[in-house]
Amino acid sequence: MVTNSQEGETLPATSSVTGLPQKRFYRQRAHSNPIADHSFDYPARPEDVDWRSLYPNIGSEQQVEFADIGCGYGGFLVTLGEMFPDKLAIGMEIRVKVSDYVIDRIAALRMKNAETSAYQNIACIRTNAMKYLPNYFQKSQLEKMFFLYPDPHFKRAKHKWRIINQALLSEYAYVLRSGGLVYTMTDVEDLHKWIVSHMTQHPLYERLTDEEANADPITPKLYQSSEEGAKVVRNKGDHFLAIFRRI
């Protein structure tokens, strides 16, 4: 329940029609400073992660294989869960209200689909992936990583805060298996050029050809499955896609 400060009345945070949480009660600024000293609980090592608390039906040999970094309001994460029911996907989001929304959204979807066990394969955690990614994933654990509409950090002095940079690319390569894929999408051409430049210069990545990218069944979903992507489509903005393979 959420209190309307103007009216003094208590409003439901969940729609009575869909049973899903309403985004207007979870609003937060578009981006968060990744360098700030946020307070996070994080595991000391991947072996300490309690995955069963996030995925109730997880098998003893199962591991998270997809990571949506900066998952926003979870639209694309939900799509991943629908497309790959046998894979475990995690959304990582730094903003507290936004991550709360995704967690509540997944809980509501699981409840609505209790008979089919749908959406048991997706989860969200609030964390700073720029700092704590290796604390969650073992070497070569991930098959796919997604960076969709990341903060462009337009000012030159803040380019070091961009989630794609040389130091972090080595961390991503560590948790990605050989042949694993990194999907990037932005509506900012300058950021797209930055991503392509940094990833093609890194010795552990190669860019997929247009033919390879277009043949990937995930590619069409990258454009508007996420809330940010859908907004770009509504505003008739540009999309800049680049997919890279871990060598």
Curated annotation (Swiss-Prot):
Q: What is the lineage of its organism?
A: Eukaryota, Metazoa, Ecdysozoa, Arthropoda, Hexapoda
Q: What's the protein name?
A: tRNA (guanine-N(7)-)-methyltransferase
Keywords attached to this Swiss-Prot or TrEMBL record, sorted alphabetically, are:
Methyltransferase, Nucleus, RNA-binding, S-adenosyl-L-methionine, Transferase, tRNA processing, tRNA-binding
Instruction: State which Enzyme Commission number(s) the record gives.
Output: 2.1.1.33
Naming one, the record's GO cellular component terms include: nucleus
Known role: Catalyzes the formation of N(7)-methylguanine at position 46 (m7G46) in tRNA.
| SUPFAM superfamilies, alphabetized | S-adenosyl-L-methionine-dependent methyltransferases
| Record-linked InterPro entries | SAM-dependent_MTases_sf, Trm8_euk, tRNA_(Gua-N-7)_MeTrfase_Trmb
Please give the pathway this protein is involved in.
tRNA modification; N(7)-methylguanine-tRNA biosynthesis
Q: Where in the cell is it found?
A: Nucleus
